[in-house]
Amino acid sequence: MIKKEAPLIALVAGEISGDILGAGLINALKLHYPNARFIGVAGPRMIQAGCETLFDMEELAVMGLAEVVKHLPRLLKRRKQVIETMLAEKPDIFIGIDAPDFNLTVEEKLKASGIKTIHYVSPSVWAWRQNRVQKIARATNLVLAFLPFEKAFYDRFNVPCRFIGHTMADAIALKPNRSEACATLNLDETQRYLAILVGSRASEVRFLAEPFLKAAKILKQQYPDLQFLVPLVNDKRIAQFEQIKAQVAPELSVHILKGNARQAMIAAEASLLASGTAALEGMLCKSPMVVGYKMKAMTYWLAKRLVKTKYISLPNLLADEMLVPELIQDECNPENLAWYLGNYLADDADHRKQRNELKQRFTELHKLIQCDADAQAAQAVVDVLEANTSDQN
């Protein structure tokens, strides 16, 4: 039974992905509490859904150590402002959406003052810096996790966590429509395509564009009819990619797309991609993939010592087996990439059977994480909120 019909709900998002999650959560919460008031730090989608914002979310959207250091005084000032505002407003619940370096400290202060807190999107504590789980325990009443292995990790440490499924799994059809994807991209359906995703960060494009393009050149010799789709997130990445392409593969014809990664992976027979969210999206698009990743030698040396997981790509982590090849650092070379991709492009009966089996596994994993995450997240908030109000009555 709802004890408080017009709760004050605070949310802080720090980047575009968080704004999308926040808007979905607000709209789902309105079904439970039509008179709720939403305050915090919001992007355009959350504002449209009815959230009052203290300042522009863009101020928190900084990436990379150098950028964080440069903006640290402003970030600390904004964090202090959020904490002071929340302590004054005393919301019924505070929900930090991702942005753990900013939100966990806010959550810890608020929880200590008696405000219920939820952290939405688990930090990658299961992969590295596992000691952060102690801070998460101090800072939150509940963690909302996208993936089942994340909940299993928190269970080991007795930290309250609820698996809600992944919003991306809700957004992508179990059987993606290739004809529709080709029409959206203005592509000839009868052609064969390979999607090449070099990552969204400058450093990823710098390290991966060359081996990925050289692999494409090898494949073009083996499959002369093969065409290449290269979705890039913005004009900066497009310019960076074109500059590298002019040096390493000037004669190779590619379709450069601004955005549209999802449609490219649905239209393509296979994908070559950087590890990260793209691998999960590729799995949901049922795109057979090869995952490649390179970084600075020192970064790799550190990562090898810090990362605690058997796999780096989300499809393999979800399946707990090597479903798709992962080629890291020196193994991420054109010859290896082309060889593994060739297994997806070969047209004999054995390879076709392997591809169909892989797509079937992708579909099973899709079903596992397709749970209507917005509604699940809202229900979790309601449960924590009502435990709170019943405690007070």
From Swiss-Prot:
It catalyses: a lipid X + a UDP-2-N,3-O-bis[(3R)-3-hydroxyacyl]-alpha-D-glucosamine = a lipid A disaccharide + UDP + H(+). One of its GO terms (cellular component) is membrane. The keyword Lipid biosynthesis applies. Transmembrane segments: none annotated. The keyword Transferase applies. GO terms for biological process: lipid A biosynthetic process. This is Lipid-A-disaccharide synthase. It comes from Actinobacillus pleuropneumoniae serotype 7 (strain AP76). The gene is lpxB.
